[in-house]
Amino acid sequence: MYKKSIQVAAAAIINTSGEVLIAKRPDDKHQGGKWEFPGGKIEQGETVLDALTRELHEELAIQVVTANPLIQITYEYPEKIVQLDVWQVTEFSGDPIGNEGQSIQWVAKTQLFNFQFPPANRPILQALLLPDYYLISGDFEDQADCLRRVQAAIASGIKLIQLRTTEKPIPLDLVKALADYCYQTNVQLLIKQSNCSREIYNLKGISGVHLTVAELMDCNGAVITQYQKQGCLVAASCHNAEEIVKANALALDFITLSPIQPTASHPGQLGLGWKTAQQLIKLAQCPVYCLGGLSSSDVGQARQVGSQGVAGISQFWPS
């Protein structure tokens, strides 16, 4: 059955306190009565930024000064397909008002999940909460060495970490030490699912699990729902369209896409390159971190192709 497809520009408007502006949809509209990020349809001949600038002036009486891409989402409702192109507006002039009679509200990012949004908006909430960089731990000598490296990474500004180790089961003392420190410093710590017992992912300071490709392809929605109901983030490693489609079906919180560039750890394996990465990222219905042969200086390029940011091991793991 043919479904109408509409292209929408939406804005996550951030004030100087780090709060996000949301607006309530009119009751008589599609997904009426729910909260949304301001914006509207992209008219023929408009760029996304043109549409966003026009819509925010019409809806909120503000002028966009600085805006950057945040995430692109394609979501299929029973009655239509919505293609959302979301930008983060970090500078604007004027005081926002509900210019069309709509309710508006400034909300702390961490409180966004307390509001009811259309289903297509869920990835936007995650994108706003996730940082630009995702550290995947490298080799370490012992617990003290691992903790020292994690502390150094956090001191440099890292806010999202995956503890990656081949030890099974993973030493509980190590996880507790890292979880305690991450909790104290407001850093999110993920554990590989294969290393993650119920005792571990219930620890204060453990924010979620990261699935390998094999775990992703073998996983079912009930497992993911169980994790997410307990407040856990669920991420996965992806390398191709098939794996991204599976991640979409499971409604994961974010994924990594690799390898973007050739890496020393996989000699002879070609990287996807930025053009292919951009095409694959467009398939994803959640934030995507680019991984493989990248450094922190690549975050701008990653953002330009629609990524949340960059992930890394060797370039991010302190010596």
Tell what function each PLM region has.
Residues 130-145, 234-236:
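Active-site mouth loops of central-metabolism enzymes
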Residues 86-88, 96-129:
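NUDIX/MutT-family hydrolases
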Residues 1-20, 72:
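Conserved N-terminal beta-strand and adjoining loop/helix that marks the start
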Residues 174-194, 213, 221-240, 269-295:
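Alpha-helix-loop-beta-strand connector modules within alpha/beta enzyme cores
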Residues 135, 161, 201, 247, ...:
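Conserved, mostly hydrophobic/aromatic
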Residues 19-59, 70-71, 188-190:
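Conserved Nudix-box catalytic region and its N-terminal flanking loop in Nudix hydrolases
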Residues 73-95:
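Active-site-adjacent beta-strand/loop module that shapes the phosphate/pyrophosphate-binding cleft
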Residues 208-221, 254-268, 293-319:
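Glycine-rich phosphate-binding active-site loops on the catalytic face of alpha/beta enzymes
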